[in-house]
């Protein structure tokens, strides 16, 4: 699992009937991840994602708030923002505990327009390094969202 470093990813796509597609729409997605080792045993991870779609996309291409504890495709909009933080405490080289909190917004309630209906989720989890030679971690997370409590089995990092 990452303990330091940053990742920035930006992508834009165009789907067009003139190019053989079934729909006409454009997407833009931005992701920023940052990991900070604050102590020998503690790592802070930060995540910000933005996605937008223009024109007339099918329902499955409309961006949605994607976080542990939030059902997929539940909160969709032409613009979506997600911000999440995860703290990880390493007990030893093979076991760790995580805690996470995140908020999401769709174009109907982006922070600049309305913060009364922020979509938030939080939870805790445990990690075990299953393969030392490949640095593969397996985990179990418990997340609470606005609707349900959910368990997740993770292989690798959740982001």
Predicted regions and their residues:
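Outer-membrane beta-barrel architecture
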Residues: 31-33, 84-86, 125-127, 139-141, ...
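Hydrophobic alpha-helical segments
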Residues: 88, 92, 106, 128-136, ...
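Small/polar, glycine/serine/threonine/aspartate-rich low-complexity segments that form flexible
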Residues: 108-118
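Transmembrane beta-barrel architecture of outer-membrane proteins
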Residues: 25-29, 80-82, 119-123, 137, ...
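Outer-membrane beta-barrel "beta-signal"
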Residues: 123-133, 147-159
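Conserved active-site loop/cleft motifs that coordinate metal ions or position small ligands
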Residues: 97-100, 136-142
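C-terminal outer-membrane beta-barrel translocator/porin domains of Gram-negative envelope proteins
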Residues: 1-93, 97-109
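Short, surface-exposed acidic/glycine-rich loop or hinge patches that mediate macromolecular interfaces
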Residues: 53, 143-147
């Amino acid at each position: 699992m990452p303990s330091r470093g940053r990742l920035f990813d930006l992508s834009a796509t165009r789907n067009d009937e003139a190019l053989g597609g079934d729909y006409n729409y454009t997407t833009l997605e931005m992701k920023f991840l940052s990991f900070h080792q604050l102590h020998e045993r503690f790592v802070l991870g930060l995540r910000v994602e933005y996605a937008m779609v223009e024109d007339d996309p099918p329902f499955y291409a409309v961006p949605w708030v994607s976080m542990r504890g939030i059902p997929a495709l539940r909160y969709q909009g032409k613009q979506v923002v997600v911000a999440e933080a995860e703290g990880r405490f390493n007990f030893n080289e093979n076991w760790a505990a995580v805690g996470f909190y995140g908020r999401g917004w769709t174009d109907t309630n982006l922070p600049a327009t309305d913060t009364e209906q922020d979509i938030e989720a939080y939870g805790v989890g445990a990690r075990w390094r299953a393969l030392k030679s490949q640095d593969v971690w397996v985990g179990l997370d418990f997340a609470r969202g606005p609707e349900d409590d959910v368990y997740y089995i993770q292989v690798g990092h959740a982001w």
